[in-house]
A protein has these predicted regions:
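Membrane-embedded helix-loop-helix hairpins and adjacent transmembrane boundary segments
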Residues: 1-681
């Protein structure tokens, strides 16, 4: 029996799958995927090196994919970056707690800042196109003290983000298979470490693509399977089941106690907390900057905009359907916890989704949730791991240990960072588990520690007047303010500072808002004392490029020079400025649409869903979810994927022709089918 079930009050739920299945998925499948990724990446790397000049032994390729990732793959990677286990497990459990408003506010707390990041990303492309991490930019503008402050904030962000993922995923795997939760916590990062170690950021893009495809296919399957289950049968019947659930146990703070309304005090408080927390997770997560740096300049804005809007459907549709199933069916014999309701421990551990899937699809549903949990945590964890490895290699090793570091040195440091952080995150998550902290606690309090650097970091690239002192002090003061408010309100409302009280919604909302917005006040006031006016041209004076290894090859495709060299000269300032205006428009439009114009009138009207409106609500969500699947799977193939495969095929044919003609006295270098490889002597 798993530890999660043992801790739950009432009758325990027997895991539907054996421990052997858990170990096969977590260990064997993880290593198979890692091995397959390694083999595929080795083949792809070798082919791309010969045909397009992409060499994963170069840091520019390992860390930024030569800054040439196109819109389709960028959009897919953005969807994958937010496709955390928390997105599926958390959206379902807030739906169980608050009704239909919960999953909506979960989704609305994600999409606006994903799109907003397009504005940040294009600003970096305009002002410092050769950057590898956001922390490099902080160091150049404000110096080493600020660099150390923001490096600490980013590492805190990554540590808590990984803990949030691992706590939820390990709890679900334990509940489904009976596998020990600590074993799951330590074994999940193993496969991630292997394929990230080998492939760098390109591996995370490609692996994310395949993992996201599998997750979305299963999510779409569950969205349809729900209505083929005999006790549900239709959306209208599901409406009746949820309505009956509200009569059995009405929701405090919801209009008429129903689950079928957007007028939910708890849900809107969660929405405020979630959007602030997620702004912190995005701005302070260097993996988002790495993917923005990796994208071609013309792909940043459309990639992040399409990805952000498409992503909205995943927590909204899946969370609404699965939480409604759990609410409607938990008083039936088919539900795993029958005859009791789910306990608060089970809900907070994210077990709403797996229990609902087990109800409608039996062991197949359990296996499906086990698979998507594994895929989601390994995919998103890989981005976190490479983000931290980039900090340790560029911002620690290259800056403070070996300023003359070569490509080989930095790749070695990156490899060390991958291994170190994977082990550390597993150990930190284990510590949290043993002090009684779970997915729900980390989901609620995350913003307290991730938000203090939001505005000082954004001002670094958007506001030339922020002073060095303001950049250094405002996030520190913001962190202190947020933690003080968080703990103080926990004491005020619940009479004690404990794991239980600090994980409640009100202290976390107050603490998160204080952490997010107090640094604005601190930054402006400190800047007014001694204002500065930074010259953006200073960014370009910093040498961020890396010396090439003596063994590097000069690869020329069609006589045009390396793709990296072409790319570095392809930044058109006017074009980037135009993309900046487009990014600003879509950022505002997405926030207004998803957070203001759609939900707030419904909240204020105190409207309770009728059967017809609920049916339309669910249908729109399902259609949106299926469109997201099509965008994530097929858009990368249509947007350059097939073209690159054809390019590689032509180049390989050209190489074979060049090899067969080596006896000729000369080679026609103008032929589009011929390329040259000139090794340095």
């Amino acid at each position: 029996m798993s530890e999660i079930q043992a801790r739950a009050a009432g009758a325990s739920v027997q895991p539907p799958l054996s421990q052997a299945v858990g170990y096969v998925i977590v260990v064997v499948l993880g290593l198979i995927i890692a091995g397959a990724d390694k083999a595929v990446m080795m083949v792809i790397t070798k082919i791309l090196k010969k045909t397009t000049g992409e060499d994963n032994k170069k840091t520019e390729m390992f860390m930024t994919a030569n800054r040439t990732v196109r819109t389709g793959l960028t959009a897919s990677a953005v969807i994958s970056s937010w496709l955390w286990t928390t997105a599926m497990l958390g959206a379902s459990f807030v739906g169980y707690d608050y009704g239909v408003a919960g999953p909506f506010w979960f989704a609305a707390g994600c999409s606006p800042m994903i799109v907003f990041f397009a504005l940040i990303g294009i600003s970096y492309k305009r002002k410092i196109p050769d950057a590898h991490t956001s922390l490099e930019v902080v160091r150049i503008r404000y110096g080493r003290i600020a660099h150390a402050v923001f490096m600490t904030l980013c590492l805190i962000n990554n540590i808590f983000a990984c803990a949030n993922m691992l706590l939820g995923a390990a709890a679900v795997i334990s509940a489904i298979t009976g596998m020990h939760i600590i074993a799951a916590t330590f074994l999940l990062p193993v496969g991630v470490t292997v394929y990230t170690f080998v492939g760098g950021i390109k591996a995370t893009f490609l692996t994310d693509y395949f993992h996201t495809a599998i997750i979305l296919i299963i999510a779409c399957y569950l969205s349809v399977k729900a209505f083929t289950f005999e006790e549900v049968g239709s959306i209208g019947k599901l409406y009746e089941l949820v309505q009956a659930a509200a009569q059995r146990h009405p929701v405090s703070g919801n209009q008429d106690g129903t689950y079928l309304t957007m007028t939910s005090k708890g849900a809107i408080l969660f929405g405020i907390l979630h959007i602030c927390s997620n702004f912190g997770l995005v701005i302070m997560d260097t993996s988002y900057f790495i993917k923005a740096f990796s994208a071609a300049p013309s792909s940043v804005v459309p990639g992040y905009t399409i990805g952000g809007i498409a992503y909205f459907a995943i927590p909204w549709a899946l969370g609404t359907i699965m939480s409604s199933l759990a609410l409607g069916l938990e008083n039936t014999a088919s539900f795993p916890t029958y005859p009791r309701r789910m306990t608060s421990t089970e809900v907070s551990n994210g077990l709403v989704l797996p229990y609902a899937a087990m109800t409608i699809a039996g062991k197949g549903g359990a296996a499906a949730v086990l698979l998507i949990t594994f895929m989601a945590v390994t995919s998103t964890l890989s981005a976190q791991v490479i983000a931290v490895s980039s900090i340790l290699s560029f911002d620690v090793y290259r800056e403070y240990i070996n300023r003359a570091a070569s490509d080989r040195d930095i790749i070695r440091a990156s490899h060390f960072g991958v291994i170190f952080f994977a082990a550390f995150s597993a150990g930190f998550s284990t510590m949290l588990h043993y002090v009684g902290i779970d997915l729900g606690w980390t989901l609620y309090m995350l913003g307290v520690v991730t938000c203090p650097g939001i505005f000082p970091m954004a001002f670094t690239i958007l506001w030339r007047r922020q002073s060095r002192a303001a950049a250094i002090l405002s996030p520190i003061l913001g962190m202190a303010t947020g933690i003080g408010v968080w703990l103080g309100t926990a004491q005020h409302f619940y009479g004690a500072v404990s794991v239980s009280s600090t994980g409640q919604i009100l202290p976390c909302v107050y603490g998160t808002v204080a952490s997010a917005f107090s640094p604005i006040v601190y930054s402006v006031l400190i800047t007014l004392v001694k204002p500065q006016r930074y010259d953006w041209a200073e960014f370009r004076k910093e040498k961020l490029g890396l010396e090439r290894l003596d063994s590097d090859s000069d690869i020329t495709v069609n006589g045009q020079g390396s793709e990296e060299q072409q790319n570095r000269t392809s930044f058109d300032p006017q074009e980037l400025k135009r993309w900046g205006r487009i990014a600003a428009f879509w950022s505002i439009a997405t926030f207004l649409g998803h957070w203001v114009l759609w939900p707030l009138p419904m909240y204020g009207s105190k409207y309770v869903f009728g059967k017809g409106f609920f049916t339309a609500w669910v249908i729109v969500g399902i259609i949106w979810l299926w469109i997201t699947m099509l965008v994530a799977i097929f858009y990368p193939l249509l947007d350059g994927g097939m073209q690159q495969m054809l390019q590689i095929s032509r180049a390989l044919r050209g190489r074979r022709e060049a090899v067969t003609s080596t006896s000729l006295p000369s080679v026609n270098n103008d032929s589009p089918e011929v390329f040259r490889v000139n090794e340095k002597s």
